[in-house]
């Protein structure tokens, strides 16, 4: 019987890198709301007392970057200088310029259906039937822990919590089936006055136990709650944050491969984002159709070229039909050209800020999580 452990981590919305992601996507959403055809590449840097927003934009829209930034930071919960970061007093620097015309000529076409990819690159999508949202369990529960931390912070159930937090969950597998949780790490920023014993009890009873299924916890499960003993200085005061630094947290927690491109701040013409969403959509529908228990899709592009340069499928020995058949089904049922996938998933609209914390996948409010192609895939696979 083959045994192994697998670990994934997540971070809260108050983590410095996630602050940056949320600001970048707030800017993107505000622009797309006015101009759905805008080209946006927005990068953010945060550090004690300051935010710098930069990048390239081609749009007819006007957005108040400073007010948008302050609103985003305020919603996250950095509202007092005691935290080392205050939405109302931090400096906001705007360094956004125009997108290069060299890129524009490669992307834009007279016929929008022939729109070229905004860059070269390779993207992966993944799905697994080990959870009801067809995501790997380690990243799913790592996200759930920090999401719960945010909820009990914001509703004052645990009023001594502050916005910055990280989680990590190690699952035990036998023959690729979950048999339990081996270890849980949760580190949360807190105010100076709370005792270590109150913090540990509060986190265990209010965050960990309500989130993790009891049948996967046992006397051997190890819990590490604020293992350094103190986490008062956090957020941008503790570390600088940058857009696009949490690409494994954003995707599959390391369970699947990653092409290297980040998501936040990028409009749908950037295949780093849109094709990764489409690849998840494809993989999820293949698993939902019962054509595989696990499925990883790779798609690649050349800048200025509409058709993908490659499509490949890996089912890790769980496929019910050959991978050659699956590739044929993908080509038949999914339009993976940049224009096609934007239309297929209705991506040219302001839906992105919500993706920028707690994972882009496994959340059914997003269109790439639909399983509306599963029935047709199964029928054409003749299963």
UniProtKB/Swiss-Prot annotation:
This protein's GO CC annotations: cytoplasm
UniProt-annotated binding residues for ATP: 15, 164-166, 230-231, 239, 245-246, 262, 266
UniProt: K(+) binding residues: 43
Assigned keywords, A-Z: ATP-binding, Cytoplasm, Magnesium, Metal-binding, Nucleotide-binding, One-carbon metabolism, Potassium, Transferase
GO biological process, alphabetically ordered: one-carbon metabolic process; S-adenosylmethionine biosynthetic process
Region (Flexible loop) location: 99-109
Residues engaged in binding L-methionine: 56, 99, 239, 270
GO MF, one annotated term: methionine adenosyltransferase activity
Known catalytic reactions: L-methionine + ATP + H2O = S-adenosyl-L-methionine + phosphate + diphosphate
Intracellular or extracellular location(s): Cytoplasm
Chief location bin: cytoplasm
Known cofactor(s): Mg(2+); K(+)
Binding-site residues for Mg(2+), renumbered to this chain: 17
Cofactor note: Binds 2 divalent ions per subunit. Binds 1 potassium ion per subunit.
Pathway as given in its UniProt record: Amino-acid biosynthesis; S-adenosyl-L-methionine biosynthesis; S-adenosyl-L-methionine from L-methionine: step 1/1
Alphabetical list of CDD domains matching this protein: S-AdoMet_synt
UniProt family annotation: Belongs to the AdoMet synthase family.
Function, in words: Catalyzes the formation of S-adenosylmethionine (AdoMet) from methionine and ATP. The overall synthetic reaction is composed of two sequential steps, AdoMet formation and the subsequent tripolyphosphate hydrolysis which occurs prior to release of AdoMet from the enzyme.
NCBIfam families named among the record's database cross-references: metK
Protein name per Swiss-Prot or TrEMBL: S-adenosylmethionine synthase
Annotated source species: Shewanella loihica (strain ATCC BAA-1088 / PV-4)
């Amino acid at each position: 019987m083959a045994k192994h452990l697998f670990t994934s981590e997540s971070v809260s919305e108050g983590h410095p890198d996630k602050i940056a992601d949320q600001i970048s996507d707030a800017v993107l959403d505000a622009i797309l709301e006015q101009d759905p055809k805008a080209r946006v590449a927005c990068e953010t840097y945060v550090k004690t007392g300051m935010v710098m927003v930069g990048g390239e934009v081609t749009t007819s829209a006007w957005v108040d970057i400073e007010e948008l930034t302050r609103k985003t930071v305020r919603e996250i919960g950095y509202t007092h200088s005691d935290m080392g970061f205050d939405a109302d007093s931090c400096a906001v620097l705007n360094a956004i310029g125009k997108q290069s015309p060299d890129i524009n000529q490669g992307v834009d076409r007279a016929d929008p259906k022939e729109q070229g990819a905004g860059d070269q690159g390779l993207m992966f999508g993944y799905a697994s039937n080990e959870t009801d949202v067809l995501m790997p369990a380690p990243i799913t529960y790592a996200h759930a822990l920090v999401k719960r931390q945010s909820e009990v912070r914001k509703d004052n159930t645990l009023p001594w919590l502050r916005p910055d937090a990280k989680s990590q969950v190690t699952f035990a597998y036998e023959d690729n089936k979950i048999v339990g949780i081996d270890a849980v790490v949760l580190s949360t920023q807190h105010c100076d006055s709370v005792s270590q014993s109150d913090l540990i009890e509060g986190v265990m009873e209010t965050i960990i136990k309500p989130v993790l299924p009891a049948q996967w916890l046992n006397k051997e499960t190890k819990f590490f709650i604020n293992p350094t003993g103190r986490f008062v200085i956090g957020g941008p005061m503790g570390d600088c944050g940058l857009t696009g630094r949490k690409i494994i947290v954003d995707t599959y927690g390391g369970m699947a491969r990653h092409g290297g491109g980040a998501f936040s701040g990028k409009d749908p013409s950037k295949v780093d984002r849109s094709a990764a969403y489409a690849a998840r959509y494809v993989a999820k529908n293949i698993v939902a159709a019962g054509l595989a228990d696990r499925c990883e899709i790779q798609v690649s592009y050349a800048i200025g070229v509409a058709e993908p340069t490659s499509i490949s499928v890996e089912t890790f020995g769980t496929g019910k039909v050959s991978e050659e058949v699956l590739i044929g089904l993908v080509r038949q049922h999914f339009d993976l050209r940049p224009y096609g996938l934007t239309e297929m998933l209705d991506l040219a609209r302001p839906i992105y800020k919500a993706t920028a914390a707690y994972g882009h996948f496994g959340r059914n409010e997003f269109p790439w999580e639909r399983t509306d192609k599963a029935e047709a895939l199964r029928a054409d696979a003749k299963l």
